[in-house]
Amino acid sequence: MQPRDLAHLRTPSAPTLTPDGRLLAVAVGRIDLEADEYRGELWLLPTDGSAPPRRFTSGRRDVRPRFSPDGRWLAFLRAGDDDKPQLHVMATDGGEPRRLAEHPLGVESFAWSPDSTRIAYVARVPQEGRYGTNKDVPPEKEPPRRITTFQYRVDNIGFTFDRRPHVFVVDALAEDAEPVQVTRGDYDHGEPAWSPDGASLAFVSARHETRDEDAISDVFVAPAAGGDAVRVTATDLAVARPAFSPDGATIWFVAVEPDLAGRPTMLWSVPADGSGKPERLTDPERYDHDPAFGAGILPLLVDEDAVTTITLDRGAIRLLRFPVDGGEPAELLGGQRTVHDYAVAGGVVAAVVSHPLSAGEVVVVRDGQERTLTDFGSLLARSASLRPMEELEATAPDGAKVHGWILKPAGTGPFPTVLMVHGGPFAHYGWTLFDEAQVYVGAGYAVVMGNPRGSAGYGEPHGRAIVGDFGNLDSQDVLALLDAALEDPDLDGDRVGVMGGSYGGFMTTWLVGHTDRFRAAISERACNAFDSFEGSSDIGWFFVPKYNGTDRDRVLAQSPLTYADRIGTPMLLIHSEQDWRCPIEQAQRLFVALKQRKVEVELLLFPGEGHELTRSGLPSHRVARFEAVLDWWRRHLSPAG
């Protein structure tokens, strides 16, 4: 795979089924390198495979399709030239889409009412005079912002305290219906879910007194026509994905303990009227239902007997059906692959599933029989030679097992080797097509990557093993994995580089400050100094106390910048100018420290980008980044290097 092969990627998402399970709609995203933008259309296909998929819409970027419960209508989000996704609806049998509402900042998510007549959705409501609400006042001439809270901005979104997300309801069938704002107040609201009778909406919000000082949120229920909201969960949890049981008596949701430090996300339930305490259904030693692990919406699908949701397990994301009485779950889709999105209707399970050689295909299960209905990955497969992942297990010095993978180029080695470290730290590498690894393998480098302690998908003790001790057990695990990989004679142990982004950037800088075994390093969007990160990052105010502690000496001891005087390895630092997660000062401080000591170092800055450059940045910037990375490895890991 080469950098410009990004244009050949097709990424399906958000499958939705008609109630009889016969027809499926799915969004398919793609990159247009000539226009330097992302595009997407909706496709329709019969679930019995009797006809090939056909493109159903032709908007600039159409995403998140959802059939109405009666199957007559298809709602979706369409982004026009202003990049603001707006809610649209069209007849399932065709016709022109109709926009239901227009919001200056677009619509974020939505849900059909049970009777197929209304749609609840979430949209940010900007303060008057900001974000284009006054056409005579451009952004640079807006009044100053007065900040009084910890939580006032989010990477890749921007300032949030002056554009709160609220829940609205709109008549989906009336021509000129006016949306009704259901929620009010200086709070964030999201993830609306309808009660079975269509009278109420459950949603997620944080309205408790200390909401600015913690990550706690609750499930609330309010009349769909507007009115006072009732909190039904009064817990110390961060909640998401509420869904009513069919009888309306119970609300199911996922939640994680609010310190968020290596904690798996669990499945919970609570009486819908708030009369009882929430109860946990699943075990943090066995499951993790974090919706962030998928690429899309990942709802909870609740019926009389079970809740269908995903779980992360050793790099795989499986789709399971959990009995509401607490029995053993049934696996609907498993194996060494990743379930991104899913839907269930009419006895059919539909999902977008990826694996190491495919960015995603639509898979259906009917009567226990699995069938793949699409071949979206064929375009990339024809243009690029994709390489398989070989599973690897290593043993750390203390006996802990470390799980990972090797990807090797075609041909015979020994190949120069790149050790990759993921972000998070409570994240994971897994069984899916990873464009970065494929590009490096395509350029002739073996890639080693894995999930050291601190990663997700291996139980809570594994995830929390590094709390208060960054750079110790995790670095031992990473190096143990590299040592195990280098036992393969196809990998050249004398030509090894290391790279990673975010927490992976932290680990990259940490490693070159503690060993000289690497020829070169690439540290991207890194956290290098937790003392300044605590104040400059959008999450620093809670991340550092929860993950690194409050003792200043210990915080500095866990900061790679503390050991900059030990670094002699050539380093390429890559950062985005608008990164609010790991702000640019994290790269600048390291750059200056190394320049002052005459260490070979370069700083590559991307204008207009945030923390998500490698995943959703401007396509031309993603290609430029790939080219810079390959140039750096060519200079430092080449056979004559």
Indicate residue ranges for each PLM-predicted region:
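Active-site-proximal cap/loop segments of hydrolase catalytic domains
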Residues: 452-641
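Short, solvent-exposed loop/turn segments at conserved positions within beta-propeller repeat blades
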Residues: 34-39, 80-85, 158-164, 211-217, ...
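Predominantly five- to eight-bladed beta-propeller fold
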Residues: 39-41, 124-173, 217, 266, ...
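Cap/lid segment of the alpha/beta-hydrolase catalytic domain
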Residues: 376-494, 501, 533-535, 539
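Hydrophobic beta-strand positions that form the internal "hydrophobic ladder"
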Residues: 24, 71-74, 119-120, 201-202, ...
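Residue-level detector of Asp-centered blade-edge/turn motifs that repeat once per structural unit
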Residues: 19-20, 69-70, 114-115, 196-197, ...
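Multi-bladed beta-propeller domains
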Residues: 1-11, 44-63, 90-106, 133-135, ...
